[in-house]
Amino acid sequence: MQNARMKAHIPTLSLAEVETPQFVSAIGEAYEQYGFVIIENHGIPQELIDRFLDQFKTFFAWTESEKRRFHIEGGGGARGYTPFGIETAKGSAHFDLKEFWHIGRELPEGHPYRHYMADNVWIDAIPRFRETCIEMFDTFDRTGRRLLTAIARVLKLAPDYFEDKVQLGNSVLRVIHYPPMPPNPTESIRAGAHEDINVITLLLGAEEPGLQVLTKQGEWLSVNPAPGSMVVNVGDMLQRLTNGALRSTSHRVINPVSDRAKNARFSMPFFLHFNPDFPIAALPSCVGPGRPEPLPPILAEEYLQERLREIKLK
């Protein structure tokens, strides 16, 4: 058992091989075992990542009063700035030690999904802010849909199965700032143990130590991606669709120790969602003898709102 624990690690795959049978087999095994995978050669340009992150480092360095001008009271953190002391992991008594910004999908006036998606918040004082945010959102979105072609093949579905089910999803790009730790101990951690609500999450910026995944054996496994790599995990919506065949795994971001406690941490998760009116119901191939009893169907938007209330964003 000890030897198995020592060898446990999150697999690393190259997105350049996404169409190969080997990639499909490997990502399927990773998601059944861990719910997580590390992706290299993801195709998001480093220049775009650096430009995007630099803009938010500028914003998060502003004073609290300056930042709160971009917080939408009563908006549930759907867009713009969410300050410290609000988001709390499901079942936790302590809020997460982070502040963040949300960017959503841009839809034209009159679009039938507009009432599901709040308007984005833009900062005129930061050059190219809107342009860069939209470019980053769209790039993440394309990358996620490309990964979903492999996940569809894992499930013995057509590669384009997910395309019309996520192309107008209420997906969210979040930019998180975890500040340097205070000198006094705290009961809160940077991000309490939780599962993601959505279909899949694509995460950049996980190189700084702290991200951990809860294994089937009930042990916390550190995720250590190479610089520039992306971490991609299964969310609760995909777990529900597959009746648990693909795992939405508890994960957390623990507080750093020693000199690392002096470092801020920035990360960029993209939460890819189904279209709001997509009914999440267990796939027929994931139901039957030896499988769990499936949960009842629920619309993606209803499920999202239910879960947002649990984490105190509603």
Task: Set out the residue ranges of the language-model regions.
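Peripheral, non-catalytic segments flanking oxidoreductase cores
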Residues: M1-K314
